[in-house]
Regions:
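Flavin-dependent oxidoreductase catalytic cores
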Residues: 1-203
Length: 203
C-alpha cells in the first residue's frame, strides 16, 4: 500500500495483467481515431506501471517481480502492445519517476536501464519526473518552496543524465516557470523538450 493507513492492493493475476496491457493498446487506437498526434504512457507517480517498477511496492514472486527485468516486464509489454497498435510514424512518449527518493527504492540507475529498454522497443522520448510512490520520499535538493520541498528545475538533472547515458530524447519538467530558464535547459543539451503545464493554465 502507499501508506500504512491504506488498504493492501490485490495482486493481479497474469490474465488480468494481459487484459490491462490489451486495454492500453485499445485506448491508444481510440486516441489515434480521435485525432491525437502523440501517445504518452504514464509510468510515474505511483500509477500501476510505477508500482510494478518499484522494488518497494512490487512484492511479487513471479515473472513480474524480483529483478529489475521482471519488475519492468509489465511496462515493457505495454509499450510493445501500444507501439504495435499505433502508426509507425506516431511519436510514443513514456513518463517515468526517475527516482522515488527512498533508500532501496526506484532510482536513476534503474531509470537509465529502463530507458534503454524502452528505446529499443520504440519509445521516442522519456518524460522525466520523479517521486509520488511513497510518503517517505526525501528530496535531496535545495528548498525554495518549503510547502513542496522543491526548487526551480529540480528534476532537470534526471532528463540530462538519462539523455546522456542512453541517447534517447528526454523531456524536462518541474518548476520550469521562466522562458529564459527553459531556453537555458535546451541550449545546454540537458533536455530536448520542456513540458509546460501550470504556466499555460496561469496565463
Amino acid at each position: 500500500p502507499f501508506d500504512e493507513d491504506y488498504a493492501i492492493p490485490a495482486e493481479l493475476s497474469k490474465q488480468e495483467i494481459s487484459d490491462i496491457v490489451q486495454a492500453f493498446a485499445n485506448a491508444a487506437v481510440r486516441s489515434v481515431d480521435a485525432g491525437y498526434k502523440v501517445i504518452e504512457l504514464h509510468f510515474a507517480h505511483g500509477y500501476l506501471a510505477c508500482e510494478f517498477l518499484s522494488p518497494i511496492s512490487n512484492q511479487r514472486h513471479d515473472k513480474y517481480g524480483g529483478s529489475l527485468k521482471n519488475r519492468a516486464a509489465f511496462p515493457l509489454e505495454t509499450i510493445t502492445a501500444v507501439r504495435n497498435a499505433i502508426p509507425e510514424s506516431m511519436p510514443l512518449f513514456a513518463r517515468v519517476s526517475a527516482s522515488e527518493y527512498v533508500k532501496g527504492g526506484w532510482d536513476l540507475d534503474q531509470s537509465i536501464q529502463l530507458s534503454k529498454w524502452m528505446n529499443d522497443l520504440g519509445v521516442d522520448l522519456v518524460d522525466c519526473s520523479s517521486g509520488g510512490n511513497s510518503p517517505n520520499q526525501l528530496l535531496p535538493i535545495p528548498v525554495a518552496n518549503p510547502s513542496t520541498a522543491t526548487a526551480p528545475g529540480y528534476q532537470v538533472a534526471f532528463a540530462s543524465e538519462i539523455r546522456k547515458q542512453t541517447g534517447i530524447l528526454t523531456g524536462a519538467v518541474g518548476l520550469i516557470t521562466e522562458a529564459q530558464h527553459a531556453e537555458e535547459i535546451l541550449s545546454k543539451g540537458d533536455a530536448d523538450v520542456i513540458f509546460v503545464g501550470r504556466e499555460l493554465l496561469r496565463n
